[in-house]
A protein has these predicted regions:
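Conserved catalytic core of nucleotide polymerization and phosphodiester-bond processing enzymes
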Residues: 1-177
Length: 177
């Protein structure tokens, strides 16, 4: 996904090395990025539009209007400017995902008084962890999925699919079918 946020071939090479243990030649990384951009022909155009808007405004926005200010976007230092540009491209995607999760959390909170047995424990990026009695797992999963899969706002026409895993500990989770 880094390519969507402006990852360069050398960055892809490093990511493949340290996260997947692959020694990928730089030329292969260049080809991967070129092919990805060919598969998504409007990607490069979108990236340029986002960078130009961010430079003009000095911030980038999520789809719901939450702003991320980018003081380095006009820097003469290439590293600082490049980082700000990647942040500008990241915000509409990852930031909007965070906004959607916050809306799902609000729906969950409203339903908690009727489900005193459902105990939210923590959030990890786009995951929510709950403590639930075994005899309430089915009911809990149905409720949580409904809250998380609800369309966050009218203009959002992308289906949201939430997956559920259960287990006695966080380390022993198994995906539910």
């Amino acid at each position: 996904f880094g390519v969507f946020f402006g990852l360069f071939p050398r960055g892809l090479q490093r990511t493949l090395k340290f996260k997947a243990g692959l020694d990928t030649p730089l030329s292969d990384c260049e080809r991967i990025i070129t092919n990805l951009k060919a598969g998504y022909p409007r990607l490069a155009e979108w990236q340029q539009v986002v960078k130009r808007q961010a430079e003009a405004r000095k911030y980038s926005e999520t789809w719901l209007g939450r702003r991320r200010y980018l003081p380095g976007i006009t820097s003469n230092d290439w590293g600082e400017k490049s980082f700000a540009e990647r942040c500008a491209m990241n915000t509409p995607i990852q930031g909007t995902a965070a906004d959607i999760l916050k809306l799902a959390l609000a729906r969950l909170i409203v339903g908690l008084p009727e489900r005193p047995w459902l105990r939210p424990l923590l959030q990890i990026h786009d995951e929510l962890v709950f403590e639930v009695p075994e005899d309430k797992i089915g009911e809990a999963v149905s409720f949580i999925k409904a809250c998380m899969e609800a369309q966050p706002f009218p203009q959002f026409d992308v289906p949201i699919v939430a997956e559920a895993s259960v287990g006695p500990t966080f380390g022993d989770m198994a995906e539910m079918g």
